[in-house]
C-alpha cells in the first residue's frame, strides 16, 4: 500500500500517575507525584525550526497563529474557551448513562463489612454515517536517520490515509523532528487546496539526523496553543521509533500545556529500539493509550484506530461525582481523582468515544445497620460533562440524573452467595494490570525470574476465582498474562519488543481504550483484549484502512 501510494503520487490497585491507590485524605500521607517543569529555546533563522535546550534568557517564542479559519458556523474561537460554561440542562438531558453495582447484594446487618462497588459510565453507539465533529489534528513525525526506507514510506502512507478520510471542516498540521523540529504544514483546512498541500508535504518527507522528541512535541503544542480558532475535538499524534535521552524531564509540562490547549495527546512507538518507557509515561500523564506498533505495516491501522475514535467523541470533560453514604476507602481508576471528604470524591475523565464505557472500582466500608433496617444506601453517583451530540460544534453542559448504589441487610451472612460477575471482572482487570506493572518493573531491572513468579501468582489468583463460567474479560486477562510471561522470559525477549507490548497492555487496560487491533506476532499468544476495548467506529476505520 505504501509503495503504491508513493508511486501513484510520485496490589491489585492502580491510580493515575501515582504509585499507590487514591486514598481518603490522611494527615500522615502526602501525594508523591510532582510535576517537573520544562523549558525550550527556539532556533534563530527558520521560523518553523526549534531545537531543545535548557532555558536561556531572551529565547524568542515562535508564532504559529496562521491556522486556516474554520468553515463551521458553530466553531468556537480559542479565546472563548476560557469563558464560563452555561448553566446545565435539566437533569434528564445528556447522552451518557450511569449504573452502579455492589459485590454482594446482601450484607450482614450486625457487623461492619468491606465490599467492592462499581460505577459505570456508558456511551451509546453511533453510526459512522452520522454527522461528526470537526477535528484539529497534528501529526508529529520522527524523520531521524533510523526512519529511512520502508519505515518512512509506511508513515507517509498512514498520514495519507488520515488526509483521505478528513472532512473539509477538519484541519491537519504536520510537524517533523530529527535533531531539530520543523512545522512542515500549518494547520490547514482539508478542502481541495489543503489536501493537495498536505499530500505534497507528506511526499517531501526525508529521513536523517538525530532524535529530538521533545522539540517535535513542543512545536506541536505551540501550534495548538496559538490557534486563532479551535475545533471542538483536537489531538496531537506523536510517532517515533527512537530514543531521546534528554526528553524525560521536559515532557511532563508539555503534556500539561497540551491539555490546557484543549488537546489530547496520543503516542505511537514502533520497532524494537524506541523508548517505550518514555512514551508510556507520556500517555499515562495525558490519560490516553500508548500504542506499540510491532510491525511497521500496521502503522496505518494504528493511526486509523486513533483517528476513528477521535471522530466519535460524544462527551468531554466528564466529572463523575461519588457521594458516599458510607466511607469510601479507595477509588481504583487511572483518571484524576479529587477527594472531597472521607466518603466523597470526583473523578475527571477527559473524553469518551461512542460505545465506550468507563468502570470505576470502589472499596467501601459499610458499618453495621441500626435496628431492623432492610436496605442501606451505599453511594450516590452523578456526572457533569460537555455533551457533543446535542449541538454540532458545541459542547452543551449536562448534569445527569443521580443513581444510587444500595445493599440489602440480612440477619446472617450468606456463605453461598456469588459475588456480582461484573464487579468481579473489573476487580480482576485492576489486579492484573497492577501485576503487569510490577512485573514490568522487575524486568526493567533484569529480574526476569521475579517477574515470572509475580505473573504466575496473578494467574493463579485469576484461575482460583471459582467462576462457574469464564467471562470475556477473564479470558482476555488470562491471555494477557500468558503473553507477558513470554515477553519477560529473558533480556532478549524483553528488549526486543517485550517492554513496549507490556506497556501498551498496561495502559490499554487502565484506560479501557485501544487504538491498534493488530495482534502481537512475537508473543506466541493471540490476544483478545484489543478487540474488547476497540469501539465499533474505531473498528470501522481500521477496516477501512485495510481496504483502501
Model features per residue range: what roles?
Residues 184-186, 359, 374-380:
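Local beta-strand/beta-hairpin segments that build beta-sheet-rich folds
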Residues 6, 40, 319-342:
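A surface/secretory-pathway sequence property marking extracellular, secreted
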Residues 353-372:
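Low-complexity, intrinsically disordered segments enriched in Ser/Thr together with acidic residues
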Residues 333-357:
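Extracellular adhesion/glycan-binding regions together with long Ser/Thr-
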Residues 2-126:
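Acidic/polar low-complexity segments with low predicted structural confidence
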Residues 98, 115-117, 137, 318-320, ...:
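Hydrophobic residues positioned within well-ordered beta-strands of beta-sheet architectures
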Residues 2, 9, 101, 108-316, ...:
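Exposed acidic/Ser/Thr-rich ligand/metal-binding surfaces
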Residues 11, 34, 366-548:
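Long, acidic serine/threonine- and proline-rich intrinsically disordered regions
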